[in-house]
């Protein structure tokens, strides 16, 4: 008897896949990799850019890769991407970021990670001229509003982000589903064969030091952290602050004010995973001074490496980090200073936070995030 069961065809916009997409790239990589392992029934079409096309590999024979070498956020994305999508005869499309083409030709799901460009708009967050920034920000608001309105389901990475979406866009809470991100199995990262001392020396780092890993966008509040560190450094001359992140306009902007710190503030730039594990392992604490986060994955990854976390108490961070962090108000320099000094000096507190961190990260699984996302796909497809 012939089996006429319909095979669904699902597309995923994975142009941010992997390191080129930074934190968003990690989310997309884990979601795509896990979903195509979990679902051996549906067909998947994965849209990639030239830079990451060869990086994505799958043993699932029902997965097809499509080259969509289209820049993010531009006019070409709005015109060419719908054309590529329409050629694939998809039943459903997943956009893991807000940048959904206005004329998307198929039903879709969208993941919203935060509303930072609405809630935290600032000219300092861009290299664009003021007029161009205002125009792009205006169109951003249109694109995200239409994406949320037209999506069959909106995925949010935290309850905080869900509530922000519901309030901002006046939509029903049931249209937004929370799918927490996961924490990668950091043990799988390659360990550098060199001695830890050699790695620290390579980056001009001496112990003890505080660590931050991530970008330097204004909402990350690294300028505030540097000001607080200058107060601590006046009392603890042997302490360093290490700010790890690929050098760009935002990191370069931080350098002139720290020129007089005599090597106390280090900018290693991009650090490969093997070296980064050692930087995590030897640090005194991980400092997360952000003013706005939709989820806060970097702090969870620090916990996974066994590092105590001292964190801002803003937005989603208390929800995500729970009781496994020492919190401060990032707009109160005296409070930030006191909490950092506390984690430096109190060995019992450090051990307690490390142990709490190991327990906290068990709440977050990429496979569970993928499973919940797949459930959303299937629920929508059953109604089509």
Regions found by a protein language model. Give the residues of each.
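Carbohydrate transferase catalytic cores enriched for Leloir-type hexosyltransferases
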Residues: 2-384
